[in-house]
Structure formats: structure tokens, C-alpha cells
Amino acid sequence: MITLLYRIYQLFIGLPLLVILTIITALEVGIGTTIGNGHFWGYYPGHWWGKLILKLFLIPVKVEGRENLEKDQSYVFVANHQGSFDIFIIYGHLNRNFKWMMKHQLRKIPFVGYACEKSHQIMVDKRGPSKIRKTYEDAREIL
């Protein structure tokens, strides 16, 4: 019975709020990076969005080992995509300003693609050697 109620909650409350919060966050990022500090606007709205979505869907998160990350050190973080919440967990709980590497097709998602472009996320295009080379060049410039 609890599972059924949770599914109803997800469908009629969680999902609509997820869409609305995603659009609002994408607009914040897009507008904020255009008129202000890209370092702040390219990360913090997404950070708050990730935390809020996890709370909205009642997903408990426990982070271990974050204290082992050195403040001025660069890292590569890899999500295994074994669940549908890893993006929210990384954004909401990693507490590191970072850049995503994502399929270039995601650029076509309304609002989200715009926000990713404005916040200089790295779009991976594997449609040929020249596109792959350009992806590496873009990544080098952004990072």
C-alpha cells in the first residue's frame, strides 16, 4: 500500500514539480550566466535543484569520504548511471563546482540545453573524428 501511495505521489506531485523546478533552474542558470558570475550561476542553482529534487522524492543521501577531497585539487568524477537519481546526487551532494560531459543531443532539450550551453558544460559529439577532436578542444578550453 505504501508503495502504491508513493507511486501516486511521484506521478502527480513529484514529476510535475520536477519539470517546473527544472525549467526554473535552467532559466536561472541561463540568465544568471549571461548577466553575472558564471562560476556561481553555472553551479549553485543546479546544486540547490539537486538537493531539492532528492528531498521532493524522499531519497535519503549519505555521503562518505568527501573530507578526502583536497580543496585546490582537480578531480574527474564519474557517474555509473545505474539509477535515475545519480545526476541529482552529484549536483546536490558533491559540493564541488564541476562541468558535465554529456551527449550533444541533450542540447536539444528545451531550457536544459540552453542552460548547459550558457554554463559551458561539455557537449560530446561522436559523429566522426573531426567532431571528437572538437569535443577534446572544447573540453581543454573549458577546463
Where are these regions (language model features)?
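Soluble catalytic domains of membrane acyltransferases
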Residues: 56, 60-143
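A transmembrane-helix-recognition feature enriched in membrane-embedded lipid enzymes
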Residues: 1-62, 114-115
